[in-house]
């Protein structure tokens, strides 16, 4: 019986050791990817924040009616959801999906969805939520190419009045262990009080290049969401894999203890049998 128990524990030790190798390797890969994603995030964030300041001044100077500021009359809402292509990243994806579900459950008929990432597509399909478009296999360092494709689709849907409001749903990165799901409204723009700078003059008039301004702003915004999402994904995966590796180490310690106790018991029993046999022969 003890021999069978020892064989079973050996198998478990081998299995857990193999799993630990995988989780440790994935943790190291995620750490390297996170480092790269954070550098990319800082670069994009500076560009995005500067563009926001410029856009605010431009919008505040527009006095004529404009659908990108005053709305287009449509009651449909578009949610662009940023998820990951790969799993094993803790609650990263499910937190985003849960936020979307809570947001659209009161008005499903007027809620439309564009999803980014294989995992988001899979979750939405299981929930029976149809999508207008799906974007997968996004590179670890997203570029303006991916952002431009999505931005053009958003502009097309909004300008054709298929949607009246556009929201970006993504995970804002703060640290490897802290991310927050945000639902950011990007269209129509919110007009604030007229700019304090009365000496700004646009030539030609802003309205003549509004479409170009809008596309560039959406590209910057989407790229910022991509950068936050990738950093959050890799931070979540690194944390999850490090936690799994720690759990595997704890389990191996317990299995080693069980193995040694069982082996000691088997040795003691064998010695007792030998001694007992010797006594019987006297």
UniProtKB/Swiss-Prot annotation:
InterPro entries: ATP_synth_F1_ATPase_gsu, ATP_synth_F1_gsu, ATP_synth_F1_gsu_CS. It is a peripheral membrane protein. Keywords: ATP synthesis, Cell membrane, CF(1), Hydrogen ion transport, Ion transport, Membrane, Transport. It is found in: Cell membrane. One of its GO terms (molecular function) is proton-transporting ATP synthase activity, rotational mechanism. GO terms for biological process: proton motive force-driven plasma membrane ATP synthesis. CDD domains: F1-ATPase_gamma. Pfam families: ATP-synt (PF00231). GO terms for cellular component: plasma membrane; proton-transporting ATP synthase complex. Its main location: membrane. HAMAP family: ATP_synth_gamma_bact. NCBIfam families: ATPsyn_F1gamma. Belongs to the ATPase gamma chain family. Produces ATP from ADP in the presence of a proton gradient across the membrane. The gamma chain is believed to be important in regulating ATPase activity and the flow of protons through the CF(0) complex. PANTHER family: ATP SYNTHASE GAMMA CHAIN (PTHR11693), ATP SYNTHASE SUBUNIT GAMMA, MITOCHONDRIAL (PTHR11693:SF22). F-type ATPases have 2 components, CF(1) - the catalytic core - and CF(0) - the membrane proton channel. CF(1) has five subunits: alpha(3), beta(3), gamma(1), delta(1), epsilon(1). CF(0) has three main subunits: a, b and c. This is ATP synthase gamma chain. It comes from Clostridium botulinum (strain 657 / Type Ba4).
């Amino acid at each position: 019986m003890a021999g069978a128990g020892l064989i079973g524990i050996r198998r478990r030790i081998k299995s857990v050791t193999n799993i630990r190798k995988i989780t440790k390797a994935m943790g190291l890969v995620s750490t390297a990817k996170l480092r790269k994603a954070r550098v990319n995030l800082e670069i994009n964030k500076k560009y995005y924040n500067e563009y926001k300041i410029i856009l605010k001044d431009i919008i505040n100077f527009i006095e004529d009616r404009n659908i990108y500021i005053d709305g287009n009359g449509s009651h449909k809402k578009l949610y662009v959801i940023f998820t990951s292509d790969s799993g094993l990243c803790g609650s990263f994806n499910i937190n985003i999906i849960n936020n979307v579900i809570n947001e659209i459950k009161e008005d499903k008929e007027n809620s439309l969805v564009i999803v980014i990432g294989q995992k988001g597509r899979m979750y939405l399909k299981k929930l029976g939520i149809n999508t207008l478009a799906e974007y997968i296999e996004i590179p670890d360092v997203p570029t303006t190419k991916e952002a431009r494709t999505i931005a053009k689709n958003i502009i097309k849907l909004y300008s054709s009045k298929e949607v009246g409001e556009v929201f970006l749903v993504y995970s804002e990165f703060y640290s490897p262990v802290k991310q927050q799901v945000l639902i950011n409204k990007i269209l129509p723009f919110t007009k604030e009080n007229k700019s304090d700078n009365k000496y700004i003059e646009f030539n030609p008039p802003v309205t003549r290049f509004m479409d170009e301004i809008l596309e560039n702003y959406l590209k910057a915004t989407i790229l910022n969401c991509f950068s936050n999402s990738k950093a959050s994904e890799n931070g979540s995966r690194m944390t999850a894999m490090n936690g799994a590796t720690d759990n595997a180490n704890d389990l191996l310690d317990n299995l080693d203890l069980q193995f040694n106790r069982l082996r000691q018991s088997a040795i003691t029993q064998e010695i007792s049998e030998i001694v007992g046999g010797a006594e019987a022969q006297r």
